[in-house]
A protein has these predicted regions:
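Rossmann-fold NAD(P)-binding glycine/threonine-rich loop
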Residues: 183-246
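Conserved phosphate/anionic-ligand binding catalytic regions in large, soluble enzymes, centered on
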Residues: 1, 62, 66-76, 228-240
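Predominant activation on well-ordered alpha-helical scaffold segments within soluble catalytic domains
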Residues: 7-18, 39-44, 76-83, 108-115, ...
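N-terminal ligand-binding/catalytic initiation module
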Residues: 1-68
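General beta-strand structural signal in soluble alpha/beta enzymes
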Residues: 25-30, 51-57, 100, 123-126, ...
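Glycine-rich phosphate/diphosphate-binding loop of Rossmann-like nucleotide-binding domains
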Residues: 58-61, 66-175
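Glycine-rich beta-alpha junction loops
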Residues: 33-38, 126-131, 233-236
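Short, surface-exposed connector motifs at secondary-structure boundaries
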Residues: 22-24, 91-96, 174-177, 196-203, ...
Length: 246
């Protein structure tokens, strides 16, 4: 869709939504497919209709009330918690291989921070398929594909010829030390948990909201896998949104 089409949709959506939200009522934030651009269009329409400049949406741009590093906050926070959780168990994050699902804000910046901390992320995914890069995901290429070109991961192989693109699901079948589900709800099922355990995965930390099914969670915990639920693991974004609201 063109920017104009996206703007028209966001403005129409907010024309109705503004009746039900407010700084002291409900405060929406971005999620899958909704970033600073879309939040900006909606915030502009809210101001136009209500005549109020208040903390009614989070994830805005820095020039109109956003918080520094809000885009990175959820992914970065996930890795800070993962690193500390591993340390509590006498394990270093550096040198570990990591599977990440998704390729939105959470996944991109979780991948970036993981590699800054010395781990190697070898997978990312989107709604059509997933990429395996044994040399480690190229974050700059991933950002260009997803944030600039708004394209599919099928483009990744143009940047990294040695990588593999697979259609459908399959991220959790790769042999890794750590799994970070960062895509969507209920994406990691019991059979995925069984594959992770069989491949020697030592930790699963949730970047998305409730990405691991109850059966999968119970299986991971029963098999001694370190598990961090999203309520704690992805709270970096919420914490930074609170700063934006204030």
């Amino acid at each position: 869709k063109s920017d104009r089409e996206v703007m028209a949709f966001c403005q129409s959506f907010m024309t109705e939504l503004c009746k039900y939200i407010g700084a002291d009522t409900d405060v929406p934030a971005g999620d899958i497919g909704t970033g600073a651009r879309e939040i900006g269009y909606m915030f502009g329409q809210y101001k136009r209709i209500r005549g109020l400049y208040e903390g009614v949406l989070t994830g805005k741009g820095l020039t109109y009330g956003g918080s520094l590093a809000r885009t990175e906050a959820t992914g970065y926070g996930l890795l800070y918690l993962t690193e500390e959780l591993l340390k509590l168990n006498g394990i270093e994050l550096a040198g570990k291989t990591v599977a990440v699902s998704g390729s939105g804000n959470v996944a991109i910046y979780a991948t970036e921070k993981a590699q800054q901390l010395g781990a190697k992320v070898v997978t990312v995914s989107d709604s059509t398929g997933w990429v395996y890069d044994p040399e480690g995901i190229d974050v700059a290429a991933l950002k260009e594909i997803k944030e600039v070109n708004r394209a599919r991961l099928t483009e990744y192989k143009k940047y990294r010829p040695n990588s593999e693109y697979h259609e459908g699901r399959g991220v959790w079948n790769v042999k890794v030390d750590i799994a970070l589900p960062c895509a969507t709800q209920n994406e990691l099922h019991l059979e995925d948990a069984q594959a992770l355990v069989a491949n020697g995965c030592i930790a699963v930390c949730e970047g998305a909201n409730m990405p691991t099914t109850l059966e999968a969670t119970e299986y991971l915990q029963k098999n001694g896998v370190i598990f961090a639920p999203g309520k704690a693991a992805n709270a970096g974004g919420v914490a930074t949104s609170a700063l934006e609201m204030s």
